[in-house]
Structures are given as C-alpha cells and as structure tokens.
Amino acid sequence: MQCALYDAGRCRSCQWITQSVNEQLSAKTADLHRLLAGLPVEQWCAPIGGPEQHFRNKAKMVVSGSVEKPLFGMLHRDGTPVDLCGCPLYPASFAPVFSALKPFIARAGLTPYNVARKRGELKYLLLTESQFDGGMMLRFVLRSETKLTQLRAALPWLRAQLPQLRVITANIQPVHMAIMEGETEIYLTDQQALAERFNDVPLWIRPQSFFQTNPTVASRLYATARDWVGQLPVRHMWDLFCGVGGFGLHCATPQMQLTGIEIAPEAIACAKQSAAELGLTRLHFQALDSTQFATAQGETPDLVLVNPPRRGIGKPLCDYLAQMAPRFIIYSSCNAQTMAQDIRHLPNYRIQRVQLFDMFPHTAHYEVLALLRRL
C-alpha cells in the first residue's frame, strides 16, 4: 500500500507498510506458530486476509489547530500535529465528512483543545460507518458541557450537509490526559444506535460499545465461528466477553440455549436488540463480569466461547474452565501471546484447529480463532 503520510515521515502507525500483504501474512503466521510451539495443533487452517486499504470503519481524530482552521489527526510526542484526513486506511466516504466538519467547528464555536495550555473544548472526533447502509455515528469528545447549546444550535446545518449522520453525541471527557472518552454520553439525535449487518445477522453499534474496525475480516471471523460450532454437538453455550453479541448471534440456533456476558451495558443493549430481531428467545445477554459470572455457575455448558481483551482471560478463569471442563472451548484473541499463555493453563484440552485473521494489516497485530477439545 502506498501512503503519502508514511513516505513523508509524518506517520509511522503502519509499521509494516513496506512489506507486501503476503509477506505480512507469512510473518504473522510464523509468529503464531512460534507462540503455540509445544502445544499440539491438529489442523492449521489457511489464514484469512482482507483489503489492504480503505477497510477501517472508524476514525479517531485528535482535534488541534484553531477554531477557524481545525486540524484532524494526531499529535506527535513533541506536540506537533499531523493531519490524517488522507489516511488510506479510511474509506472514501470519510473525506466529505471531514470537509464539512471543518467549517462546522467554526460555526459551533468549538475551540480545539490545546494540550500544552490546557484550554479549549473539542478534544476528539470519533466517526464510525456502517457497511450495511452507509449510516454514520459521530461523537464530539468535549472537555465540558459549556458549548453544548452552541453545538445543538449549529447541528441542523451539519445534518443538512451530511444526512448520513444517523447518530450524533457529545461525550464529556474533563480529564487532562490522553483518554479517548469519558463516562458521560449526551445524545444529540433521536437515533441512539447504528445499524450494521454481518452475514445476514443484524448488529447494533452504540457510542460506548466495542466493535471491530475491519468489517470485511470481522464478518469472516464470525462466519468461521458459526461454521465450527455448527459441526459440534452443542445445545448449551456460553459467550463470554461477548461485546455486542457478534459471536453468539452467529452461532445460536432456535434450539440452542446461549448466555452472553459482557461488562459494558451499552454493548449488552445492542446484543439484546439483535436477539429480539432474530426471534431467538433462548438467548440471554447480561451485563456482568465474565469471570465472576462463570465461577458462580453450577452448570456446565457444552461449549464456552471467550473473546477477551488483549490481557487474555487470566489464570482464575482458566483454572475454573479446567475444573468445569466443558467439552469444547473456542478462544478468539487479538493477542496470541496471552492466548497461548491461557491455553497452557488448560492442560486437559487439545487445539483441534486454529486460524489466523489479518484484522490489522500493515501492523504486527492479528486475530486468532482456536477450537479446543477436551481430552
């Protein structure tokens, strides 16, 4: 992939950009083999890739500059701003949104936050696009609620320019730290969730719910999990760290009993909405800590699917799963190193199959799906 920002030395986020996609996949596959060395794997499935550019459905932009000439992008460690509107990872549909937002910021009087001076209001712009219908969610991350009245007053102009903006919010992040969002979310539109659809499964994206940033590869990840589960004798399943329910909603059948657990209430609200649309009455989603939920149960499901954050599921949950001994475990991971550590704490399981998904091209990161069978 050719990138003018990288060539000019202004951005180094895509550290592997000089390698071909095939070279990147080979290196990632070798890394996964290294991490799983000593763990018997019955089947290595071919890695899954996707587009090398224009694949991201989300932009996280630091806002700097002035209210008359705002700049969207990032700040180097020395405070130097870099305009990332031309980043080739973004789809072409983002460009008109960035173009309209620059004069809008002046109209609304949203002074960009100055990190050095600790002054200003607008810290970040967070933009998400649905691949289903092109609808978008825009979040203004503000230092305070001071400019809310001005923002509301100026919104009709912005919505006339950009009718694809279905969900608009103001997130309040008052802390002088590089934290992307605060706890308070104020909706500026009637619609509060963005509709998405993978493999004919309805999904919903809310402001504070995690959603994969590479829809093409994510849809194949979910479809693969569905295929694997469909080949197994599963009537009762847990989906831990379930997020908006992507895995569980794909894997569930009308006859299957499935419980999805996620600590974020916003994500659980999305999952429940999707389950209702699908008419799956035996799916139950709850906003709880996954480890605390699992260790408090007295029953053993046929299969436990885990999709933890980068830190992995941790030894306490590994120990409990080893003791509870479900027949199957599916582990989806964005950090193969912690996944390998966790699997080593499950000595009574063998990896039946494993597959790499190149969710993050031009970086060393990747997603992995592993099916474990009890010995």
UniProtKB/Swiss-Prot annotation:
Keywords: 4Fe-4S, Iron, Iron-sulfur, Metal-binding, Methyltransferase, rRNA processing, S-adenosyl-L-methionine, Transferase. The gene is rlmC. CDD domains: AdoMet_MTases. This is 23S rRNA (uracil(747)-C(5))-methyltransferase RlmC. It catalyses: uridine(747) in 23S rRNA + S-adenosyl-L-methionine = 5-methyluridine(747) in 23S rRNA + S-adenosyl-L-homocysteine + H(+). The active site is at C334 (nucleophile). S-adenosyl-L-methionine binds at Q212, F241, E262, N307. One of its GO terms (biological process) is rRNA base methylation. Disulfide bonds: none annotated. GO terms for molecular function: 4 iron, 4 sulfur cluster binding; iron ion binding; rRNA (uridine-C5-)-methyltransferase activity. Belongs to the class I-like SAM-binding methyltransferase superfamily. RNA M5U methyltransferase family. RlmC subfamily.
